[in-house]
Every structure is written in C-alpha cells, then in structure tokens.
Amino acid sequence: MSSKGVKMGLDLSTTSVLLDGQFLRGDLRYALGSVDYTGSGTASAQPDWYVEARVLIGKDRAINDAVLSPYFGLGYRYLFNDARGITSTGAAGYRRESNYIYLPIGIIHRMALNDQAQLESTLEYDHLLAGKQVSQLSDAGLGYGDLNNTQNKGYGLKLSILYKKDEWAVGPFVHYWNIGKSDTAILFRYGTPVGTGWEPANNTLEFGLKAGLQF
C-alpha cells in the first residue's frame, strides 16, 4: 500500500547561547495536508497531519572560514491519518496514529558567502527509541477492537540546505523515515480473540522547499 499527498507546514525554532560556544535549541514543526491511498482499492483526499517537537544541545566550532555545529537531543513525532470511509473495492478504512520517540544526532555547516549572506547545510540521523502504533479498527464498523502495537526498530534521515541573507532564508529539504515491523497484538472481534495483528514495516519520504524569517 502507499499514500501520497501534499502538505503545508510551519516550523518554529529558538536557540539559547550557552558558555564556550554551546547552544540549546528547541524545534517545533506542524504539517497538514491530505493523501491519496492505493492498496485495498483506492481512496482520495484523506486528512493527514503530524507534529514534531525536539530539544537539541550542541556546540559551535570555527574551522577556517566555516562553522561546524555537532548536536544531539531528544525528539517526539506524532502522525495522524484519517482513512475512514470505503475504498473503490469496498474495503473499510480507519484512523491511524503513530507515536515516535527518537534520538537526533546531526551536524550543521555554515559558510559565509559575503558580508550579508551565508549557506547553511544540515545532516541528521534519527535513531528510533520507542514507537507506538494505534489502529482504530473500530471505525470500520465490523466489530473489531482497536489495535495497539509497539515499534522499536527504525531510523530517520534529514538533509536541508538554506541560503540565508539578512533575516531571510530559503532552501530545499528531504526527510526520510524507515520503521520496522511492529510486535504482534491480540485482535478482538465483538470482545472475542480472533487472531493477531501488527503494523508492517513502512517508510516515509518527504521533500519540499522551506522559507523562513529570523527575528
């Protein structure tokens, strides 16, 4: 199965300068849109959104004409997909919630282009620490209970390039997640165990263009 769509998002970041070039940074990202589903039939315009929050600590290191800033921290990602309704083949959909706690490890490279502009590149690896998947199968109206699974294997990658001039910034980004198969949980129908269910391995690729204002 696959889901594809377009989102609009908002990023907020704040940085506090500490001693000896160290810094503390907080990030908050919200993205909202809709996706088209292909799998057990097709369905279009399913609401889909996520929110991501992180706390990072790092240190700036001047090297020649550039600044390298390695960092690490703790992040949380929540994704919601509303697939309720009937697909083109008559399959019933349901809501899904993904919860990830992860360890971000990355490095920022900053290079001055002139007195007013600089190029900033960021490369990050995200190690999944804990994940929980909630499948609200009761939405399908077939007597099934909701399913809760844990996902503890996976990783993410983030790459971005920003051209900054004065207080403005613009540039492309790519985000990727690869999450392993979950554990199995007992599946109930009308309160009676009828089998087991799990969340299959999945991956997410997100790319786009970011524009920002610093103040």
Sequence positions of predicted segments:
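Residues that define the transmembrane beta-barrel architecture of outer-membrane proteins
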Residues: 2-10, 32, 45-53, 66, ...
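Extracellular loop and loop/strand-boundary signature of outer-membrane beta-barrel proteins
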Residues: 1-2, 35-46, 87-96, 133-151, ...
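Transmembrane beta-strands of outer-membrane beta-barrel pores
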Residues: 28-36, 74-82, 111, 123-131, ...
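Transmembrane beta-strands of outer-membrane beta-barrel proteins
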Residues: 22-28, 53, 66-74, 103-105, ...
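Predominantly the C-terminal beta-signal and adjacent terminal strand-loop region
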Residues: 121, 147-215
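Outer-membrane beta-barrel channels and translocator barrels
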Residues: 15-21, 60-65, 112-116, 164-168
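Short glycine/proline- and aromatic-enriched beta-strand/turn motifs that initiate or cap beta-hairpins
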Residues: 1-39, 206, 212-214
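Outer-membrane pore/translocation modules
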Residues: 33-106, 196
